Amino acid sequence: MDAKHPVRTTEKTLALVEELMQKGPCGVTELAGDLDMGKSAVHNHLTTLQKHGYVLKDGDDYRVGLKFLEVGGHSRKSMEVYQVAEPEVKSLAADTGELANLLVEEQGMGVYLMRAKGDDAVDLDTYAGLRTNLHTTALGKAILANLPESRVDEIIERHGLEQKTPKSIGTRQELFQVLEGVRERGYAIDDGERLEGLRCLAAPIKSSSGEVLGAISVSAPASRVSDEDLHGALPERVLSAANVVELNINY
């Protein structure tokens, strides 16, 4: 929900943080130019952030500090779905030898809470805290399929249907057709829709009242995951992991 009376000073501080996050270490002059702010104002924001450990200074450049990791770690640790799912995600990775993930929805985006690597897992661009469009991942589609249609429409309106690869879902009609299939099967598939050459299978994690709390998945190169795998032992293992998490949360 948009704030009725946003605080401009706070918005400018956050814009600086996000610019540093996207670009990496930057100096005052570069940041001022990129954000159309005065150099004095940029310097004041940065030194305040530095004072509290959120920004560090290396020479003439500033970079995001690890204080944000402390804040994010605290937020993640306080979430019951993370506490309960963590051992299952690790077990899923060990059993399959692949990459296992846990994702939740926040403000219409998917947020990776954790990942665990099996012996043969590929090293992807995902990390705890990474945000991604829900419609491009099996994890996200598992969540979307269990949200009210009106909520899905809100997410589309806010974030659109960005094409990450040629296989990404690009229309509302296509998305809702896919989500119907997810509900029928009980799990979602991503066949190169966020990263080409990668296949992913995910199952939702739901509360006793049916509220979707997140999703758990396994990701692997397409060369190691056949069509038969996507409809055989792999969904059984992922669904089993999701079921264990649900039982531990609900009972």
Curated annotation (Swiss-Prot):
> Keywords in UniProt for this one?
Activator, DNA-binding, Plasmid, Repressor, Transcription, Transcription regulation
DNA-binding region, residue intervals: 28-47
Which species is listed as the source?
Answer: Haloferax volcanii (strain ATCC 29605 / DSM 3757 / JCM 8879 / NBRC 14742 / NCIMB 2012 / VKM B-1768 / DS2)
- Pfam families listed in its UniProt record: HTH_IclR, IclR_C
Describe its function: Essential for D-xylose and L-arabinose catabolism. Activates the expression of genes involved in D-xylose and L-arabinose degradation (xacABCDEF) and represses its own synthesis. Also up-regulates the expression of the genes encoding the ABC transporter complex XacGHIJK.
In Swiss-Prot or TrEMBL terms, this protein is called HTH-type transcriptional regulator XacR
Deletion consequences: Deletion mutant loses its ability to grow on both D-xylose and L-arabinose.
Outline the subunit composition: Homodimer.
List the SUPFAM superfamilies: GAF domain-like (SSF55781), Winged helix' DNA-binding domain (SSF46785)
> Which GO terms are recorded in the biological process aspect for this UniProt protein?
negative regulation of DNA-templated transcription
Top-level taxonomy: Archaea, Methanobacteriati, Methanobacteriota, Stenosarchaea group, Halobacteria
Q: Where is the IclR-ED domain?
A: 81-251
Q: Which GO terms describe its molecular function?
A: DNA binding; DNA-binding transcription factor activity
SMART domains per UniProt: HTH_ICLR (SM00346)
Q: Which residues form the HTH iclR-type domain?
A: 7-66
